[in-house]
Swiss-Prot record:
Binding site residues for substrate: N123, T173, K177, R295, H327, S379
Residues the record marks as active site: K175 (proton acceptor), H294 (proton acceptor)
Quaternary structure, from the entry: Heterohexadecamer of 8 large chains and 8 small chains; disulfide-linked. The disulfide link is formed within the large subunit homodimers.
Required cofactor names: Mg(2+)
Name under which the protein is recorded: Ribulose bisphosphate carboxylase large chain
Gene: rbcL
Reaction(s) this enzyme catalyzes, per UniProt: 2 (2R)-3-phosphoglycerate + 2 H(+) = D-ribulose 1,5-bisphosphate + CO2 + H2O; D-ribulose 1,5-bisphosphate + O2 = 2-phosphoglycolate + (2R)-3-phosphoglycerate + 2 H(+)
Modified residues (N6,N6,N6-trimethyllysine): K14
Protein localization: Plastid, Chloroplast
Length: 477
């Protein structure tokens, strides 16, 4: 390079490292309707000011890098950079802050959850200047959400397909989750559906193992569905898990499910990946299949309070990527989930417009502009004594899944299904008559036991079962 060239290249450019806050901390910034807004829980290293930590998050998740580069002059950083526009201390925590960051819409590819997360929760989470970092919430602008298809069908279309209204849907995960032959698996599916359940379900790790290949399972489950439908006069379904090692194999399994006339397939959206999930959701809408989503691996990402990503963000991402059901905790069962926090992201899944409400962990007002809703699924350690609470907490637009709470019945699978259906119908009737499920729940169940021996037997088995542990992830109050 000639001396003349060196001189020209250096005009207006000063090499070196400068504080992030000089460029990316902009407390006077007024957010735009088109910005993606993020709330990060930031735990800086000792000696790192909160403004510098928040600015570093904004920089490293958008246009910034660790040093000044001369190619900054070839673009408009002011147009494309992320901006930390507000910082607040976390109640009850020392040296921990909520940093609010605004991202210009042009930073993200349309219709791609994969690209959105690659930027916002990418390398910045390994940044040395931070002891820990957690994404608490996102505000998705309507101009971005409209680039997504969303759920294949949504709540109302699903109810119309199933012809079931005015109550939660009932499901059951077939147990043991691994080890059954396809024929015995299909038998369990039939018994549960025949007993009164709406759905049965593959467990998340049932794919295509040596003891039960996927095609055999699909065939026996389809036979079980048709037999149960013929005997009950109700539409039934089984969540056929299409999750596979490649997108091509996943779609092949979904195609076979459709050819069998199955109403619904299933996907593990975190282990399978957002690209695969969106592809499957598009196929399901085009071909009339409902899509059940399991959140296997979510607790690796969302359970720790100081680092990772809250499930409300994963729930929003799923609604954009596509799914008609998603597991959302139970509040009362064996899995993590504080009541107000759970109800917050349940609303984010189902409702069209959700107001900011920090008492439920909702940092931003979210407008889904008529994107179809997702049914929350309560599953994990629940049984008939939980039915009043589940009906009261989740309401009609939900799926209540009793795996062990069905197949663990002392009389067998079908009586277990009968017990759950009777308990649900009793709770719905009592609620419709104006009774208080929270206060009178146990009495309602005992009354139903008088005319349902199956329910009475279930109540006796599970009368002492409780999961009383404090949740790890709690609201900042």
């Amino acid at each position: 390079m000639s001396p003349q060239t060196e001189t020209k290249a250096s005009v207006g450019f000063k090499a070196g490292v400068k504080d992030y806050k000089l460029t990316y901390y902009t407390p006077d910034y007024e957010t735009k309707d088109t910005d993606i807004l993020a709330a990060f829980r930031v735990s800086p290293q000792p000696g790192v000011p909160p403004e510098e930590a928040g600015a570093a998050v904004a920089a490293e998740s958008s246009t910034g890098t660790w040093t000044t580069v001369w190619t900054d002059g070839l673009t408009s950083l002011d147009r494309y950079k992320g901006r930390c526009y507000h910082i607040e201390s976390v109640v009850g925590e020392e040296n921990q802050y909520i940093a609010y960051v605004a991202y210009p819409l042009d930073l993200f590819e349309e219709g791609s959850v994969t690209n959105m997360f690659t930027s916002i929760v990418g390398n910045v989470f390994g940044f040395k200047a931070l002891r820990a970092l957690r994404l608490e919430d996102l505000r998705i602008p309507t101009s971005y959400s409209k680039t997504f298809q969303g759920p294949p069908h949504g709540i109302q279309v699903e109810r119309d397909k199933l012809n079931k209204y005015g109550r939660p849907l009932l499901g059951c995960t077939i147990k043991p989750k691994l080890g059954l032959s396809a024929k015995n698996y299909g038998r369990a599916v039939y018994e549960c559906l025949r007993g009164g359940l709406d759905f049965t379900k593959d467990d998340e790790n049932v794919n295509s193992q040596p003891f039960m290949r996927w095609r055999d399972r699909f065939l026996f489950c389809a036979e079980a569905i048709y037999k149960a439908q013929a005997e009950t006069g109700e539409i039934k379904g089984h969540y056929l898990n299409a999750t596979a090692g490649t997108c091509e194999e996943m779609i092949k399994r979904a195609v076979f499910a459709r050819e069998l006339g199955a109403p619904i397939v299933m996907h593990d959206y975190l282990t399978g990946g957002f690209t695969a999930n969106t592809s499957l959701a598009h196929y399901c809408r085009d071909n009339g299949l409902l899509l059940h989503i399991h959140r296997a691996m979510h607790a690796v990402i969302d359970r720790q309070k100081n680092h990772g990503m809250h499930f409300r963000v994963l729930a929003k991402a799923l609604r954009m990527s596509g799914g008609d059901h998603i597991h959302a905790g139970t509040v009362v069962g064996k899995l993590e989930g504080e009541r107000e926090m759970t109800l917050g992201f349940v609303d984010l899944l189902r409702d069209d417009f959700i107001e900011k409400d920090r008492s439920r962990g909702i940092f931003f007002t979210q407008d889904w502009v008529s994107m179809p809703g997702v049914l929350p699924v309560a599953s994990g350690g629940i049984h008939v004594w939980h039915m009043p609470a589940l009906t009261e907490i989740f309401g009609d637009d939900s799926v209540l899944q009793f795996g062990g709470g069905t197949l663990g019945h002392p009389w067998g699978n079908a009586p277990g299904a009968v017990a759950n259906r009777v308990a649900l119908e009793a709770c719905v009737q009592a609620r419709n008559e104006g009774r208080d499920l929270a206060r009178e729940g146990n009495e309602i169940i005992r009354e139903a036991c008088k005319w349902s021996p199956e329910l009475a037997a279930a109540c006796e088995v599970w009368k002492e079962i409780k999961f009383e542990f404090k949740p790890v992830d709690t609201l900042d109050l």
